[in-house]
Amino acid sequence: GHIFPAVSIANAIKTLQPDSEILFVGAEGRMEMQRVPAAGYPIKGLPVAGFDRKNLFKNIPVLIKLFKSQRLAKKIVKDFKPHAAVGVGGYASGPTLKVAGSMGIPTLLQEQNSYAGVTNKLLAKQAKKICVAYEGMERFFSKEKIILTGNPVRQGLTNSTISREEAVQS
């Protein structure tokens, strides 16, 4: 999913810059609206939803939600005034990073998968850098923008006191 890598990125930023302010923007009614506050971060919701690739007529309400999300994202970005915007490929990344980029705010994408998601592919052109987990992502993104970082991992997973043998037995 997108939530835990995003929280891991936020945690890393807070470790490096403890006084930094971080605001998440998520899709209303989705898991991030509970998980992000549980991780200690504020979140604003957008009514955005994914497109139905099989039945185009079902996308009329989705388009209306997208336009509304674009307007709300603009207000959120204007009010928060971020120095940068990071997208991890979730539905809310689209309108939020599109608006941030159009306002001259540097955008960064993080792609967790070996096959790039639709949102990240659409945002790639305006992104300043694209962090990827796998080699060979040049087939989706400009080689000059790619940074091979691997996937962000939650601190609790990397600081485990469980041995490899115990983990395999679980």
Enumerate the language-model features and the residues they cover.
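Residue-level signature of catalytic and energy-coupling elements of molecular machines
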Residues: G1, V36, G89, S114, ...
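Short amphipathic alpha-helix
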Residues: H2-K14
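Alpha-helical segments flanking ligand/cofactor-binding loops in enzyme cores
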Residues: N11, Q34, K98, N120-K121
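Conserved nucleotide-sugar phosphate-binding/catalytic loop shared by glycosyltransferases and other
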Residues: T15-K65, Q70, K143, I147-R154
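Active-site-proximal region of nucleotide-activated glycan assembly enzymes
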Residues: M31, P42, G101-V168
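Glycine-rich, highly charged phosphate/nucleotide-binding loops
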Residues: P61-K78, S160, R164-E166
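Glycosyltransferases and closely related glycan-assembly transferases
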Residues: L72-V86, A92-L108, K121-Q126
